[in-house]
């Protein structure tokens, strides 16, 4: 018999120690990785529930296993909330991740060898949008599009590439682009050659839900997203669509299960349902508005201090620092800021002279600091500290001084009070 008082601390001290150390790290470090966020205790409660025990292959009302009457309710809640939140008439909440959601879309709509137009990884795209080291770059003929000299998406070049190569699919979305994407323009280009227009909005889904960033769902044939990042839910994926194309919806469902996944993770789907409900609350909109304000506040300080920001600013939750002119690598910047308890990630910049393992830039995002309660004042202060570190990247005294400031502000703004 299993006893509810069983716990990790008494049974596996080594594992528990590592888990507790991660809790301390999260509380005592400032998180600026654009794809990371803090989920709510309600989501974590769902993920630690007995739903983890239930196998439920299939979809609500059409399961291959018995005993699914209650997990059917859970999944249907998540589906209905996803559709309502994003203005879709189709939602699949089963993908285990954003990458898995993308796999399902590709395998539903493409054949190996088909031509796909996707954003260049070095210009802000994502691995699953055609990187040669990823399945997408290995299975499909990828034609990249990118940004112009101003740092904005080059729609003229995209249209030219589309006309020349006649891709079966055009991918919108990014992992390191700070501008507003013109979804309608991209759909127009796709329609001009009879291509599918697929959007991966993983990075901006929370902003979209709150009306802070344009919604791609009315424009795309299919949209995917993660449920963490700006949406602040559990780690997982969603597929969305609208337009009433039931044949498309059947293809997408079949591509998720049984083609690419087996049983859904019902405890995670419950977490998605909670997060989607939270995203409908008025305070979530206020939060997302503040995310955008904080990113802009940080950019202003970096520009004042003489740092180059790709595209010159941000219209969402993230931005890229281009450190080429400072003769600092992204790897060294990441390490120095890390010693000051500020977590970022090294990132390639356009025309980067360094390898992807070294890079010449760092990506910075505001969702996690905003979740802690940072406003513009704290965001500007933080950006100033980061400039102090980068201006004195080998000065351990400066790094230690900033670390103490970070510890103090983290104590003032705990992740979980």
UniProtKB/Swiss-Prot annotation:
Recorded GO CC terms: cytosol
Pathway linked to the protein: One-carbon metabolism; tetrahydrofolate interconversion; Amino-acid biosynthesis; glycine biosynthesis; glycine from L-serine: step 1/1
Residue sites binding (6S)-5,6,7,8-tetrahydrofolate per the record: 121, 125-127, 355-357
Cellular location(s): Cytoplasm
Modified residues (N6-(pyridoxal phosphate)lysine): 229
PROSITE patterns: SHMT
Site keyed Plays an important role in substrate specificity: positions: 228
Pfam family, one: SHMT
Keyword field: Amino-acid biosynthesis, Cytoplasm, One-carbon metabolism, Pyridoxal phosphate, Transferase
GO biological process, one term: tetrahydrofolate interconversion
Disulfide bond residue pairs: none
EC main group: transferase
GO MF terms, alphabetically ordered: glycine hydroxymethyltransferase activity; pyridoxal phosphate binding
Entry's EC annotation: 2.1.2.1
Catalytic activity: (6R)-5,10-methylene-5,6,7,8-tetrahydrofolate + glycine + H2O = (6S)-5,6,7,8-tetrahydrofolate + L-serine
Cofactor names: pyridoxal 5'-phosphate
HAMAP family: SHMT
Biological role stated in the UniProt entry: Catalyzes the reversible interconversion of serine and glycine with tetrahydrofolate (THF) serving as the one-carbon carrier. This reaction serves as the major source of one-carbon groups required for the biosynthesis of purines, thymidylate, methionine, and other important biomolecules. Also exhibits THF-independent aldolase activity toward beta-hydroxyamino acids, producing glycine and aldehydes, via a retro-aldol mechanism.
NCBIfam families, alphabetized: PRK00011.1
Complexes and interactors: Homodimer.
Family to which this protein belongs: Belongs to the SHMT family.
Protein name listed in UniProt: Serine hydroxymethyltransferase
Biological classification of the source: Bacteria, Pseudomonadati, Pseudomonadota, Gammaproteobacteria, Enterobacterales
